């Protein structure tokens, strides 16, 4: 037989595995030559370190067969014959009894293949089909085999055949002759070495490494193109294959993306055609197109029969039975026992899959619950975050309000001091007025007396003059006094007007404050309601979370139990897995032994084939001998023996394949189960982690909830402290009143009883003789009196308990009084703080007034300085103009003089004209300079205007600030008025507190009275007991006397009187109860009013604190504005200084220009006098020395200096 060229190539170390190779090229002449020469394969190759399956085609009988090869280079092999026959069916699919061997190159999922696959066995250029596929080694049976393109190995399970398509016509007729075979073998590859050594030594060039064209010559062009097209889809990863050949029936050309079944059997069909063609005559005969059909053996028919579904127990039994039955000589009963044992061992693995599904379902439920708990925790955290800012804001508001209240109290005290001072001043003024009026009356009386004296005494004229002087002086004094009085009255009127205005503002502020207080109170109520609701929700959520936590703990316990059970089961299954693994290794070793035996059989077959080939060569050498017939007979016998051996080998291979498949299936099942066990362990570990995290989260959430609840409880306690104290005081007052009323009623009852007892005693003393006969009735009365004594003792105990409770109530009232005193002290401190803040505000106001005045003064100074600078500039300009006029006049005079002289000197006119032109140019330049100076002047004027506007703006801003300050003062006055009102409210509260104290004192006095009454009652009781004892003794002495009628009537009358008294006392009791209820209602109303007033005061304090803060902010803004004005003032000062410097430079420049002009004028005059030349006309001279030109010169010089 021929060996593949890949065997000759050097190959690396190969692991144990199944290698599958498909050889489609016919037997070459070189190989036949090697067989003829008797070349024998070494025996050690059959026992190499690797094994595999190589599919080759033997071209003797025209039929292919499967050869088991060791996978090593040069290894021998033996084959199993594959028989074929024509099929008369027209459908194009394989029949159910087809015996086509499994083609490992038909379809393997997930691996790309080259588009052109070679069918030649000697093609070294093939990258896939030329190499043997390798399965897993014996050491790697426990783990899953890697499926990557680099390692192109696969198990026997993945190598399933596909349905065959209609192939080319194949002639299965008997061989034509031996001569044709000889010619066939001799015609191919003559110059090459034969046999395995030739393959080893021969290396084909790349040009000759092409696929065999043995079949392509017989196939039409369309089938070749179709095969080439189908080879591209040969390794589609989306393909799915079936393990049964008869189940796949598809058309030959399908447009679907799945590979065509033609690609699955293209190689087998080609090999069979090649085998048939190799034994035909050189002249090919025309053949009818028929469908392929292969002969079937009983083994393949048994494998292809309808079986149970793959996942059922029957299917597993059948597979295990087939595996154990193949190649064993045991009885059916022993084989079935083994099958049952294997199934029992595999049953727990199936159960593990169900247990793993349950664990996965439990894990899903746990994850859902974890998500729900996390959501709830997030919601609670959000609620807490929402409540925290409100709580913090309320605390801040409380602090701010307390600060504002303290500041307002200080302001109130300050205002009170100012009001007292104003009252003192008014009183002083009133005293002065009274004194002035008294002086006026005294002076009037003096005037009247003086007038009388004048009338009486008509003395000399000097005396009259003295008197008149005195009168005049007194009149002047009176006028001065009247003027002072008028001034004082005017001041009083102004003060009264201011007071009325303040009162009106205070009323408005009070109304606004009341509204604001109500609004704030409503907001506080809403906030408290929201807090209560949030607390209720938090408590509910906490309860829900606790319940869920308990559920989770129960679930965790159950999961832990399941984990322990699963761990035990996994240990058991691991032990079972190891046992199965050992059994599989044992079976693998048996398979290896069987394969070794197969290889030995193949070696023997190869030797026989070589012998036969030698004989054939000898027959060719001696064609005319008589031995030819015998050789042919021997050939037929050997062919029959080969067929039998091939059939046996095929059966053994099928059995081995089945065993391998079943073993691989069991291995895959065991691997899947092991993977599931590992996944379960990982899932259990993850579940434990998640449970720990859940516990930590629950603990954190519970801690956070506890903290939030504690904070909310503290807030609620703080808020409810005042309410609870007030309610407790009210309830205690009500209880005291009720107890007092009850005690009064009991005292009345006891007094009535005492009065009745005294009357009874008097009567009994008068009628001792009558009562002695009625001893029995009196004993009954004594029993009744004993019962009354018991009731009195119970009443006494009740009174003692009530007295104790009253004492406790008094102690509580004392504590409340202390708390109220502390609150009053705190209010006093807050008032002091308000006073201090008011003083600070006044000081800040004074500083602002001072700064504003200073800024106004500085602005005025700046304006005056700028005006003075302008005036100086204007005066300088006027001076310059006057000087220029004078110079022009002098120049005109000189010109007139020069005109007279020019008449004499007319010779130098030309020179003078040139000089005149030059002077004209100079005048034009001076005019330009003058224009620039005017422009500079205008710019300066504009700058001055801008500065004036800025000063005006600053003044306006200062006026606005002054207005704002006035507004602040008005607000402060309003706040002071509000403070006064708050002081009034505080005074009212103190009055109410005093009233409560008075009521407490009254209650104490009443309690003392009750105690004294109780002592009196006890004394009366003692006296009654003594009287009872006396009566008992008297009754004992007067037992013999009997007067029942009179005593009975008297006792009945006494009973009626007592009943009437009891009814009257009950009526009084009802009246007292009604009065007590009314009083209780009044007390409750008073407590509610007190609470409202306290809240009102607190709200007012908060508002005042807010207003004080707003005023502080306004003061800060005013200070910032003042700083900004200072900066602007400094900028203005800098600009003025720069202007002064520019003016000084201009003045210096003007002086220098004046000097230059005087020098030029003197020089021109000297030249004119020296030359004695006259001008043409006076007009030209006047035009040259025009005053405007001189002014332009001056302005030009000024502009130059300014530009510098």
From Swiss-Prot:
It comes from the Eukaryota. GO terms for cellular component: bicellular tight junction; myosin complex. Residues 1162-1204 are annotated as: Tail. The keyword Ribonucleoprotein does not apply. Belongs to the cingulin family. A motif (ZIM) lies at residues 48-62. It holds the Pfam family Myosin_tail_1. Residues 126-140, 166-190 have a biased composition (Polar residues). Homodimer. Interacts with TJP1/ZO1 and SPEF1. Residues 207-231 have a biased composition (Basic and acidic residues). It is found in: Cell junction, Tight junction. Residues 25-48, 68-269, 1156-1182 are annotated as: Disordered. The keyword Amino-acid biosynthesis does not apply. The lineage of its organism: Eukaryota, Metazoa, Chordata, Craniata, Vertebrata. Residues 360-1161 form a coiled coil. Deletion of the TJP1/ZO1 interaction motif (ZIM) decreases but does not abolish colocalization with TJP1/ZO1. One of its GO terms (molecular function) is microtubule binding. This is Cingulin. Probably plays a role in the formation and regulation of the tight junction (TJ) paracellular permeability barrier. The modification N6-acetyllysine is found at residue 581.
């Amino acid at each position: 037989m021929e060996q593949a060229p890949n065997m000759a190539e050097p190959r690396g170390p190969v692991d144990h595995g199944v290698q599958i190779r498909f050889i489609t090229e016919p037997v070459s002449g070189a190989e036949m030559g090697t067989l003829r020469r008797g070349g024998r394969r070494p025996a050690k190759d059959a026992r190499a370190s690797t094994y595999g399956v190589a599919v080759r085609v033997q071209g003797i009988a025209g039929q292919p067969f499967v050869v088991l090869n060791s996978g090593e280079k040069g290894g021998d092999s033996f084959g199993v014959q594959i028989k074929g026959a024509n099929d008369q069916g027209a459908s194009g699919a394989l029949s159910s009894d087809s015996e086509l061997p499994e083609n490992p190159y038909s379809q393997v999922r997930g691996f790309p293949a080259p588009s052109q696959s070679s069918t030649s066995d000697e093609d070294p250029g093939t990258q896939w089909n030329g190499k043997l596929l390798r399965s897993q080694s014996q050491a790697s049976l426990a783990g899953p085999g890697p499926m990557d393109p680099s390692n192109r190995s696969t198990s026997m399970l993945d190598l399933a055949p596909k349905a065959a398509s209609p192939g080319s016509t194949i002639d299965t007729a008997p061989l034509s002759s031996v001569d044709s075979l000889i010619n066939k073998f001799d015609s191919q590859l003559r110059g090459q070495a034969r046999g395995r050594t030739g393959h080893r030594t021969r290396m084909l060039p790349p040009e000759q490494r092409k696929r065999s064209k043995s079949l392509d010559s017989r196939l039409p062009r369309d089938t070749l193109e179709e095969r080439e097209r189908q080879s591209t889809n040969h390794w589609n990863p989306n393909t799915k294959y079936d393990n049964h050949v008869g189940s796949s029936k598809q058309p030959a050309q399908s447009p679907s993306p799945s590979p065509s079944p033609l690609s699955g059997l293209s190689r087998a069909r080609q090999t069979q055609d090649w085998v048939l063609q190799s034994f035909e005559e050189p002249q090919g005969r025309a053949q009818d197109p028929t469908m392929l059909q292969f002969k079937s053996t009983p083994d393949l028919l048994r494998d292809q029969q309808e079986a149970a579904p793959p996942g059922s127990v029957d299917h597993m039994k059948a597979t295990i039975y087939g595996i154990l039955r193949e190649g064993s000589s045991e009885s059916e009963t022993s084989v079935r026992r083994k099958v049952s044992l294997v199934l029992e061992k595999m049953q727990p693995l199936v159960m593990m899959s169900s247990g793993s599904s349950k664990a996965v379902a439990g894990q899903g439920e746990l994850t859902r619950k974890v998500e729900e708990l996390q959501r709830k925790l997030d919601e609670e955290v959000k609620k807490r975050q929402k409540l925290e800012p409100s709580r913090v804001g309320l605390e801040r508001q409380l602090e701010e309000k307390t600060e504002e209240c303290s500041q307002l109290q200080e302001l109130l005290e300050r205002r009170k001091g100012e009001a007292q001072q104003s009252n003192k001043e008014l009183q002083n003024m009133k005293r002065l007025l009274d004194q002035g009026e008294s002086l006026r009356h005294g002076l009037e009386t003096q005037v009247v007396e003086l007038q009388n004296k004048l009338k009486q005494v008509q003395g000399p004229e000097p005396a009259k003059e003295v008197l008149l002087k005195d009168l005049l002086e007194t009149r002047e004094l009176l006028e001065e006094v009247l003027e002072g009085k008028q001034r004082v009255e005017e001041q009083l009127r102004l003060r009264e007007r201011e007071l009325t205005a303040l009162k009106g503002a205070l009323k408005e502020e009070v109304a606004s404050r009341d509204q604001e207080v109500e609004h704030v109170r409503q907001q506080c109520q809403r906030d408290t309601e929201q807090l209560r609701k949030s607390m209720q929700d938090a408590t509910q959520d906490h309860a829900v979370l606790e319940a869920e936590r308990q559920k989770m703990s129960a679930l965790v316990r159950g999961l832990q139990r399941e984990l322990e059970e699963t761990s035990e089961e996994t240990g058991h299954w691991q032990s079972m897995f190891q046992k199965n693994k050992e059994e599989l290794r044992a079976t693998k070793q048996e398979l290896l032994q069987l394969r070794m035996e197969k290889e030995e059989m193949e070696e023997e077959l190869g030797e026989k084939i070589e012998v036969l080939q030698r004989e054939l060569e000898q027959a060719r050498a001696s064609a005319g001998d008589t031995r030819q017939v015998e050789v042919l007979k021997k050939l037929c016998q050997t062919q029959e023996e080969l067929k039998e051996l091939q059939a046996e080998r095929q059966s053994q291979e099928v059995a081995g394949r089945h065993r391998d498949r079943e073993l691989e299936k069991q291995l895959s099942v065991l691997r899947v189960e092991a993977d599931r066990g590992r996944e379960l362990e990982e899932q259990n570990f993850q579940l434990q982690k998640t449970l720990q995290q859940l516990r930590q989260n629950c603990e954190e959430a519970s801690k956070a909830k506890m903290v939030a609840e504690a904070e909310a409880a503290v807030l609620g306690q703080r808020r409810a402290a005042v309410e609870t104290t007030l309610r407790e005081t009210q309830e205690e007052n009500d209880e005291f009143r009720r107890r007092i009323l009850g005690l009064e009623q009991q005292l009345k009852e006891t007094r009535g009883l005492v009065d009745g007892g005294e009357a009874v005693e008097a009567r009994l003393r008068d009628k001792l003789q009558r009562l002695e006969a009625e001893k029995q009735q009196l004993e009954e009365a004594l029993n009744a009196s004993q019962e009354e004594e018991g009731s009195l003792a119970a009443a006494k105990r009740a009174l003692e308990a009530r007295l104790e409770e009253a004492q406790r109530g008094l102690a509580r009232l004392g504590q409340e009084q202390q708390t109220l005193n502390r609150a009053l002290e705190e209010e006093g401190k807050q008032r002091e703080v308000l006073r201090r803040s008011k003083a600070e505000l006044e000081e800040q106001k004074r500083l602002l007034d001072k700064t504003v005045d200073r800024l106004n003064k500085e602005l005025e100074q700046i304006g005056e300085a700028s005006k003075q600078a302008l005036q100086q500039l204007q005066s300088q300009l006027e001076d310059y103009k006057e000087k220029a006029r004078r110079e022009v006049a002098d120049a005109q005079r000189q010109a007139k003089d020069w005109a007279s002289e020019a008449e004499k000197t007319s010779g130098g006119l030309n020179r003078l004209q040139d000089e005149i032109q030059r002077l004209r140019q100079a005048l034009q330049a001076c005019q330009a300079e003058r224009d620039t100076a005017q422009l500079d002047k205008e710019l300066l004027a504009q700058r001055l205007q801008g500065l004036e506007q800025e000063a005006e703006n600053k003044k306006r801003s200062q006026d606005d600030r002054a207005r704002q300050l006035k507004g602040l003062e008005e607000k402060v006055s309003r706040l002071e008025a509000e403070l006064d009102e708050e002081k009034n409210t505080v005074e009212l509260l103190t009055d109410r507190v005093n009233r409560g104290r008075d009521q407490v004192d009254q209650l104490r006095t009443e309690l003392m009275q009750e105690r004294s009454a109780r002592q009196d009652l006890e004394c009366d009781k003692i006296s009654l007991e003594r009287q009872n004892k006396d009566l008992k003794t008297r009754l004992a002495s007067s037992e013999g006397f009997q007067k029942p009628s009179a005593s009975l009537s008297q006792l009945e009358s006494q009973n009626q009187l007592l009943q009437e008294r009891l009814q009257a006392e009950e009526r009084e009791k009802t009246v007292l109860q009604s009065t007590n209820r009314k009083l209780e209602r009044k007390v409750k109303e008073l407590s509610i009013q007190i609470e409202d007033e306290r809240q009102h005061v607190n709200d007012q304090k908060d508002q005042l604190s807010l207003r004080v803060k707003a005023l502080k902010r306004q003061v800060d803004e005013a200070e910032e504005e003042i700083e900004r004005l200072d900066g602007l003032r400094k900028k203005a000062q800098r600009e003025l200084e720069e202007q002064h410097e520019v003016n000084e430079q201009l003045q210096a420049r003007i002086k220098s220009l004046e000097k230059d002009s005087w020098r030029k004028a003197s020089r021109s005059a000297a030249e004119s006098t020296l030359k004695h030349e006259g001008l043409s006309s006076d007009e030209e001279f006047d035009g040259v020395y025009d005053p405007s030109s001189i002014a332009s010169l001056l302005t030009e010089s000024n502009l130059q200096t300014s530009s510098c």
